[in-house]
């Protein structure tokens, strides 16, 4: 049974009344009054009534809860007024006051005790839970209770097993389930925190100011929080979360904003009472009821808090927080009222949090995250001022700013030089210059001046190797021609008689389809000119063009030069062999074998009539063979008419000598006229192992307007013959031959002699259209009578024409 304790105000002695604030048993009042709460019996619930003579009745009820946590309704009982209004003292009720005790218990404690008694009896009436031998509660879920057959209502350890399959042992009380279900949702049985923050517009209530502030934010028309209420709520929240000293100090800070005179100000803020320290140490909860004052303009509302035990936070931290709250309150009191002051007050915590985050952040992360945002709102000058102001607070700004500006100017000048040197004239962006002095200090003016004086030296240099070759060739062509003419007067060396290397033969492999692929050609021996790349374009019916790329990067067309296409047919085991011919400049060319038993095509060039030489002696002929006007036959695949075998049944790979610079003068040549040609191949006796080889060749040429020098500006002799005979101007490489005009019927090599037969039908190369046979011996090239085929019988050469007529020719 509860024993209430009445609290009566009494006048305190002057020795007991402190000058400032007082604190007894954790209860502090910011007034000259002193309240003391003492329970009658510590083991029973206690009720305390607070009253003041000059105020409306105030009451605080403190109760020790039972195991079933629930809210105890409190009854407000007006306290009698005492004649002395100076102070009040709470004294415990003695045993000599039965009337007060009876009245209080009958009015406030009796309904609560009767309610507890009925609940306890109903709980005892419930059946005991069924437990197994291990102590586990054996019961199915409630939603399966009606369908489960074997639900035991007694302990399995004491009872016996049932063999029945019915629901006889299952007993479910519907009314009991309904009562339990109703009790689960009974608000009176739940310990809910009171919602003291209500919206005056929509009647919604919230536990704390945060919910009410969120409600005002979502519904702006309902109103907004009072700044004073926000500050008082912050202060009260910090005090109730701390220890006893923290609560005392924060209550004092709240009292600073209230009127000092208790009689003039009307109602004060409610006093928070708590039970004795023994109850707090046991972890008992304390429910505090707050009363509203009669005059709202002079009071402050504090929400109730549940205190569930002392916090483990250090008192020093809580004291610091409480001091911060006091400073914020004083600052808010000094600020003029209005929404602007409230906005500044709300922004201060966010600034504090941001400052704390910046202190914890690393420098690298700070630069990465904050610098892009800062660069958008801060100018360079403002950043310079801030940087200088941080380090030089007491010094003048300009020397420090000038020092920083010099560093900045140095870096910008370096970047400017890099920009001008890299971009130059190819820059797509325009550089706008507003101050000439700044441009001059950065070096831009000097750069523009140099560009006007030497425009070629500033731009990027991208000279191709082809352009270099053409420029060198054009610049020194005349000089090289004069040097070549002078070298032609030197002694003439005989051609080196060497066999072709295996690598060269392999590199000159033929394509059976008659198409030429571009591939590098290498020199056959020492003293040759650099290797060239020969690319033969696809053959057309009208023209044939060959591109020759020199070793030094120069490119020139070889189509105007002599292009000989040779193909040998092997009659003893081999189908075809790839032959090689070299021009007078020492450049190897291709001679690809065509299809088996087919003729190949060759291209020859003729000199203009006015530049041709006529020699009647063998020595003149041999000298003319070493003249620099010879052109190299370039190989090309192609097929022609097949030639019937004109020799013995065995044959092997031979070599086709070069035929160059045929005489085109549209006149009938005399028997003594000689066309300067030369066999560029190695000696025939080393290549041919049989007496005669029949070779079929066809000549095909491309028009060329004028002379074409080699990659070094002059044409060199073949092999290691460095000296040239003749004049370049007298033996140009120009030629004009059309495809399909001329064919070699047969070429027969006998020892060191070789005979060429040119069929009739050419009125451009040979004006009269007769057949001509050129026989090459060790002494030179001899023009044979027309229309013959050469054969060998010991020392006598028999020349026979295509119709079978023969004429004797002694070697």
From Swiss-Prot:
A molecular function annotated in GO for this UniProt entry is:
zinc ion binding
Compositionally biased spans, kind Polar residues: 501-510
Keywords on this record?
Answer: Metal-binding, Zinc, Zinc-finger
Recorded hits in Pfam families, A to Z, give:
DUF4764
In residue numbers, the zinc fingers (C2H2-type) are 197-222
**InterPro entries under this entry?**
DUF4764 (IPR031885), ZN839 (IPR039946), Znf_C2H2_type (IPR013087)
Q: Where is this region: Disordered?
A: 329-349, 455-555, 612-654
**Ranges of biased composition (kind: Basic and acidic residues):** 476-485
The SS bond pairs are: none
Superkingdom is: Eukaryota
- UniProt xrefs under PANTHER family: ZINC FINGER PROTEIN 839
What's the name of the protein? Answer: Zinc finger protein 839
Q: Which organism is it from?
A: Homo sapiens
What high-level taxonomic lineage is stated for the organism? Eukaryota, Metazoa, Chordata, Craniata, Vertebrata
């Amino acid at each position: 049974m509860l024993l209430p304790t009445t609290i009566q105000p009494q006048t305190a002695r002057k020795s007991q009344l402190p000058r400032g604030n007082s604190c007894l048993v954790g209860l502090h009042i910011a007034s000259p009054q002193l309240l003391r709460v003492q329970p009658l019996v510590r083991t029973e619930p206690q009720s305390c009534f607070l009253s003041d003579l000059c105020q409306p009745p105030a009451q605080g009820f403190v109760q020790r809860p039972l195991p079933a946590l629930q809210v105890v309704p409190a009854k407000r009982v007006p306290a009698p007024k005492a004649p002395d209004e100076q102070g009040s003292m709470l004294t415990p009720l003695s045993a000599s006051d039965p009337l007060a005790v009876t009245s209080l218990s009958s009015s406030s404690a009796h309904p609560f005790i009767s309610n507890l008694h009925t609940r306890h009896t109903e709980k005892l009436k419930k059946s005991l839970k069924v437990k197994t031998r291990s102590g586990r509660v054996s019961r199915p879920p409630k939603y399966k209770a009606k369908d489960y057959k074997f639900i035991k209502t007694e302990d399995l350890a004491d009872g016996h097993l049932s063999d029945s399959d019915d629901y006889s042992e299952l007993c479910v009380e519907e009314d009991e389930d309904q009562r339990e279900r109703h009790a689960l949702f009974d608000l009176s049985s739940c310990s809910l925190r009171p919602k003291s923050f209500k919206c005056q517009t929509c009647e919604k209530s919230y536990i704390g100011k945060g919910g009410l502030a969120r409600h005002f934010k979502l519904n702006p028309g309902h109103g907004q929080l009072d700044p004073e209420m926000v500050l008082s709520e912050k202060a009260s929240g910090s005090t109730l979360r701390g220890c006893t000293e923290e609560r005392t100090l924060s209550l004092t800070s709240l009292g600073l904003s209230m009127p000092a005179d208790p009689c003039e100000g009307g109602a004060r803020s409610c006093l928070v009472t708590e039970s004795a320290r023994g109850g707090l140490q046991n972890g008992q909860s304390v429910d505090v009821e707050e009363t509203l004052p009669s005059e709202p303009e002079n009071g402050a509302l504090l929400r109730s808090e549940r205190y569930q035990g002392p916090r483990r936070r250090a008192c020093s931290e809580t004291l610091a927080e409480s001091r911060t709250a006091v400073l914020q309150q004083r600052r808010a009191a000094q600020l003029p009222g209005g929404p602007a002051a409230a906005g500044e007050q709300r922004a201060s915590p966010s600034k504090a949090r941001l400052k704390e985050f910046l202190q914890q952040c690393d420098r690298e992360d700070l630069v990465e995250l904050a610098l892009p945002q800062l660069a958008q709102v801060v100018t360079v000058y403002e950043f310079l001022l801030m940087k200088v102001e941080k380090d030089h607070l007491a010094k003048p700004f300009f020397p420090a700013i000038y020092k920083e500006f010099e560093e900045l100017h140095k870096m910008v000048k370096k970047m400017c030089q890099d920009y001008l040197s890299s971009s130059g004239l190819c820059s797509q962006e325009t550089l706008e210059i507003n101050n000439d002095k700044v441009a001059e200090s950065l070096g831009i003016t000097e750069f523009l001046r140099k560009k006007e004086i030497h425009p070629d030296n500033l731009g990027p240099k991208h000279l191709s190797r082809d352009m270099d070759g053409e420029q060198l060739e054009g610049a020194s062509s005349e000089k090289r021609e004069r040097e070549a003419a002078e070298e032609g007067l030197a002694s003439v060396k005989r051609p080196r008689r060497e066999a072709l290397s295996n690598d060269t033969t392999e590199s000159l492999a033929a394509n059976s389809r008659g198409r030429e692929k571009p591939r590098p050609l290498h020199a056959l021996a020492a003293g040759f000119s650099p290797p060239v790349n020969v690319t033969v374009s696809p053959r057309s019916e009208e023209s044939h063009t060959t591109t020759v790329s020199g070793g030094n990067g120069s490119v020139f067309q070889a189509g105007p030069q002599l292009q000989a296409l040779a193909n040998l047919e092997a009659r003893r085991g081999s189908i075809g062999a790839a032959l090689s011919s070299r021009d007078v400049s020492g450049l190897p060319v291709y001679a690809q074998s065509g299809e088996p038993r087919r003729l190949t095509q060759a291209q020859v060039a003729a000199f203009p009539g006015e530049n041709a030489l006529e020699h009647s002696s063998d020595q003149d002929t041999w000298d003319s063979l070493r003249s620099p006007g010879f052109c190299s036959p370039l190989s090309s695949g192609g097929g022609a008419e097949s030639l019937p075998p004109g020799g013995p049944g065995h044959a092997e790979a031979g070599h086709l000598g070069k035929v160059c610079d045929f005489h085109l003068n549209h006149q009938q040549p005399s028997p003594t006229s000689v066309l300067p040609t030369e066999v560029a191949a190695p000696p025939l006796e080393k290549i041919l192992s049989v007496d005669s080889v029949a070779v079929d060749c066809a000549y095909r040429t491309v028009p060329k307007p004028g002379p074409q020098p080699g990659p070094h500006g002059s044409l060199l002799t073949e092999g290691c013959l460095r000296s040239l005979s003749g004049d370049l101007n007298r033996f140009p490489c120009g030629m004009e031959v059309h495809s399909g005009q001329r064919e070699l019927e047969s070429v027969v090599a006998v020892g060191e002699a070789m005979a060429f037969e040119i069929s009739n039908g050419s009125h451009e190369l040979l004006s009269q259209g007769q057949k001509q046979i050129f026989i090459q011996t060790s002494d030179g090239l001899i023009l044979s009578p027309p229309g013959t085929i050469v054969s060998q019988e010991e020392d006598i050469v028999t020349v026979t024409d295509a119709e079978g007529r023969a004429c004797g020719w002694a070697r």
